[in-house]
Each structure stands twice: as C-alpha cells, then as structure tokens.
Amino acid sequence: MSDPVQPLLDEHAQLQRELADPAVHADAGRARKLGRRYSELNGIVEAHRRVERLSEDLEAARELGSMDPELAAEVKPLEEELAVAREALRRKLVPRDPDDGRNVILEVKAGEGGDESALFAGDLLRMYMRFAEQSGLKTEILSSTPTELGGYKDVQLAVKGSSSDPSEGAWARFKYEGGVHRVQRVPVTESQGRVHTSAAGVLVFPEVDEPDEIDISQNDLKIDVYRSSGPGGQSVNTTDSAVRITHVPTGIVVSMQNEKSQLQNREAAMRVLRARLLAHQQEQIDAENAAARKSQVRTVDRSERIRTYNFPENRIADHRTGYKAYNLDHVLDGALEPVIASAVELDEKARLEQLGQDSAEQGSAGRRG
C-alpha cells in the first residue's frame, strides 16, 4: 500500500517554494489560499517528523539494548511514545474542512417566545462576541433589528480571524453553532415566576475571501430600497438607505439597514449574500454526498434543536454530543470552548471512522485486484 504521507510532504515542499516567490503574492487571493493550505500541512509535517525521530530512537535502543541496560530500559517508554505519535499523525491525516480558516457570518434570529426569545437572541449575541474576543477573533455587527426591551429580532455578526492556522479560524470555531438554541427561564415579563421555554435560531456561513470567488450575475438580483426602522418599527431615517437584495435563482433574501448610506448597506448585504451562496453551494455538494453529510456535525439540519440553556439549574446541555455542565453563567460570559470541543471531538471521531472504512475498502479492493 502506498504511503499516504509522502504526497503531502511533497505538496508542503512545493508550497514552500511557491510562497517564497514574490510573484505569487501579487495575487493576494491565491497567496492566501496557498498560505492556508501550507499552514494546514505544517501540522502533518511536524507529526511525521516526530514519528520518524521516535522510530529511529526505538530502533537504536533495541539494537544497543543488549549491551547497554540504560538503553534497554528506554525501549518500552519509546514504544508507548511512538504509538501515541502515530495516532496523532493518523488524526492529522483526517481531511480537514477546507473552510476552517475562513471568516464567518453568523446570524441570530428570535423564534417562538416573543420578547423573551428576542432577549435570549441578545444573550447569544453577547456570548458569541465574548467568546470571539477570548479566542483572539474580531467581531463586527453588520445588521440588527433591536426590540424595545433590549433584545433582537435578528442580528448579523461578522467574525474575523488573524491566525494562519486553519484550526484557529473563525469557521473552525463557530461552524457547530448552527441550529435551534432553546432557553428555559423566568422571563422578565413574567409576574407569576413561572419558567417559560423559548428558542432562537442560529445560522453560520463561511465568508467568501474574494468577491469574485462567487459568480453573481446582476441580472439575478432584485434590489429594493426603503427607510430603515428602529425598535417598535418606527422610522429612524428620512432617506431610503435600507437595502433588501433578493437572489432570484435561490430565493435568498438579505436586508441591511445599520449603516446611514444606501451604498454601505448594499455592500454589507452583498457580503452576506456571497457567504450564503457559498454555503448554498456546499449544501448542494453535501446533499449529493451522503457520507460527507453523515460525517460532519456542522451539516445537521438547521431546524434541529442543538442545545438547551436552563437558567434555574444553571445548566448547559448539547443534545448532539451529550455534553452537560452546570456553569451556564460562565458559558454565557464567553466560556464556550468546552462545549465546542465536545462537537469537535464528535466530528473528529466520525471522520476517523470514515477514514478507517475508506482504508479497509481500498485494502480489500487492492487484494481483489
């Protein structure tokens, strides 16, 4: 069976040569993509070097152990280290989500529950912004529809990363958040002290690096302008600065009203539209590939309830992974890492199982051939 690592080592070396060429950096988009792939392969190269180094040390210890008791004593620890290193390399070989290094557009929408749902949407927004800050990511509110009580009917947030490591990218951290988030608590409007259940929906899209990455024909767009409104629906602008863009072929609609100028709102709306169209393309690919859809937590139905936030018990529970903890106050303050880590672990486990099945099928086919 061919070595699955060698082609990746060759690719890493080739990328290193290309990135050293100043001409490559004249095309910022191409340089960014090459750099992202290079950073992804760095982990595989380092893991492979460690396996090779430990293999050499183990071979030397075995050969010289009969003459040197100290070297003989190193054999078992080296065997254990090598086993761990090989498993780490195997995990690195599991194909990453190619979008991990991308920035994201995150949307939070109030669901059933009226004012309480809108307030919870605001809680989720603050949680995500604090988590992003703690993760070294930058955030920008693109559009929002606030309510009179301080919540949001809907809000769109851009999250941007700066690390060259795809595993630390905005999409790598936020892609598991899409779905229905349920809250159980006593609403501020509840006079009887009864616990109510409401929900908010979260959509997460990888953002397009360059505008021309997604081909959008102007003939496919329907653009409407109107006056922006504030809490309660009252008009807050005397000019038609708000923009609504409809992508006719897909039916995707994006509205923007946060900026004061129509041009700024249009640019922001196109930014979100490109992200949605990129996600739409990926969903079509996933729909044609059942194995890919099954192996990724991020592709669960967005209408699925993924998490419950129980305030009376201070409990957070993720229904996909089984994660449960009684530190809801800390999670809402941005301590979301353990919750997301449980989704990453589940996704990685599924990918490893799929990799094992693929390897077994290839081996069986090779023996038959």
Curated annotation (Swiss-Prot):
Keyword flag Cell membrane: no
Pfam families tied to this protein: PCRF (PF03462), RF-1 (PF00472)
Gene3D superfamilies registered for this protein in UniProt: 3.30.160.20, 3.30.70.1660, 6.10.140.1950
List of residues that carry N5-methylglutamine: Q234
SMART domains hit by this protein: PCRF (SM00937)
Keywords, sorted A to Z: Cytoplasm, Methylation, Protein biosynthesis
GO cellular component terms attached to this protein's record: cytoplasm
GO-annotated molecular function: translation release factor activity, codon specific
HAMAP family: Rel_fac_1
Function: Peptide chain release factor 1 directs the termination of translation in response to the peptide chain termination codons UAG and UAA.
PANTHER family per record: LD18447P
Protein name: Peptide chain release factor 1
